[in-house]
Swiss-Prot record:
<dbReference type="InterPro" id="IPR027973">
    <property type="entry name" value="FSAF1-like"/>
</dbReference>
<feature type="compositionally biased region" description="Acidic residues">
    <location>
        <begin position="50"/>
        <end position="63"/>
    </location>
</feature>
<keyword id="KW-0597">Phosphoprotein</keyword>
<feature type="region of interest" description="Disordered">
    <location>
        <begin position="22"/>
        <end position="68"/>
    </location>
</feature>
<dbReference type="GO" id="GO:0005730">
    <property type="term" value="C:nucleolus"/>
</dbReference>
<dbReference type="InterPro" id="IPR053030">
    <property type="entry name" value="Ribosomal_biogenesis_FAF1-like"/>
</dbReference>
<feature type="region of interest" description="Disordered">
    <location>
        <begin position="181"/>
        <end position="202"/>
    </location>
</feature>
<feature type="modified residue" description="Phosphoserine">
    <location>
        <position position="127"/>
    </location>
</feature>
<dbReference type="GO" id="GO:0000462">
    <property type="term" value="P:maturation of SSU-rRNA from tricistronic rRNA transcript (SSU-rRNA, 5.8S rRNA, LSU-rRNA)"/>
</dbReference>
<dbReference type="GO" id="GO:0005634">
    <property type="term" value="C:nucleus"/>
</dbReference>
<protein>
    <recommendedName>
        <fullName>Uncharacterized protein C3F10.08c</fullName>
    </recommendedName>
</protein>
<dbReference type="Pfam" id="PF15375">
    <property type="entry name" value="FSAF1"/>
</dbReference>
<feature type="region of interest" description="Disordered">
    <location>
        <begin position="111"/>
        <end position="133"/>
    </location>
</feature>
<dbReference type="GO" id="GO:0005737">
    <property type="term" value="C:cytoplasm"/>
</dbReference>
Length: 259
């Protein structure tokens, strides 16, 4: 209900039952004057009938019964919105801004970076030196393992422990190293008769082994056939063409020339 209706209801109630203590009057607004003027005009106008007045009074009685002696009032007050102070925004803006550094702070940071770089370089140099030394030790150990059988032979003869190859042993070590690198194996210096005897003995041993394997039924590895080597400039007799033709002249070996 509007305030004008409440004011009219309060007046009607006071006319019938009198004023009640503790009941606060309803404040009238400028629209109340218009309502009063309309009500006075309606009372003065002869068109209003008694039936309409009775109906209005019945409605007002019902409203009195429903509301009782309490009148509800609603006050509308404009609530001011809190405005943010400029200092809060300024502080948040300054927090987001990067911190300005002085020249002294910049120089201190540069010095710290230089110190860290020097330390890292020293550590790298130390690790490189260790790697070089370890590699050198590995090579020496490998060399000692390769020469161990020759050094053991020398120590067994002399009775003194030798870790460095000397004399004939050093020559053997060099030849062994050349053979490992893919070089041709040099034949040892000895008389031709002794060499032929060694080869003959080796062939005899191989034949004995083959005969024993054939009798026992064991299978040996297939032997590689050696090609016969001929001297340069001569051909074997099996070829159809005798000798060699060079520059229009026929060269014959001495074995083919009749005596």
């Amino acid at each position: 209900m509007s305030e004008n209706a409440l004011l009219a209801l309060q007046r009607h109630f006071e006319d019938q039952f009198g004023h009640i203590e503790g009941l606060q009057p309803v404040s009238a607004k400028p629209s109340e004057t218009a309502f009063n003027s309309d009500a006075s005009e309606k009372e003065q106008s002869p068109t209003t009938s008694n039936e309409e007045e009775d109906a209005i009074s019945d409605m007002e009685d019902k409203e009195d019964v429903s509301f009782g002696s309490k009148i509800l009032r609603v006050s509308h007050q404009e609530v001011e919105k809190p405005t943010l102070s400029a200092t809060v925004g300024r502080v948040s803006f300054l927090k987001k801004m990067p911190k300005l550094e002085d020249e002294e702070e910049i120089l201190a940071k540069k010095r710290e970076e230089q110190k860290l770089r020097k330390r890292s370089r020293q550590n790298d140099d130390g690790s490189d030196d260790d790697e070089v030394e370890n590699l050198k030790n590995d090579l020496e150990l490998q060399k000692l393992l390769r020469e161990s059988h020759l050094l053991h032979e020398a120590t067994s003869r002399t009775g003194q422990v030798q870790l460095v190859a000397e004399g004939k042993i050093r020559h053997k070590v060099v030849q062994q190293h050349i053979a490992q690198l893919g070089g041709k194996k040099e034949t040892e210096k000895m008389p031709m008769a002794a060499r032929r005897g060694m080869k003959k003995k080796q062939k005899h041993i191989e034949k004995v082994i083959e005969n024993e394997a054939r009798e026992s039924g064991t299978v040996l590895a297939k032997k590689r056939k050696e090609r016969k080597q001929f001297k340069k400039g001569f051909r074997p007799v099996t070829f159809s063409a005798p000798g060699k033709l060079v520059g229009g002249t026929l060269l014959l070996p001495k074995s083919m020339i009749p005596k």
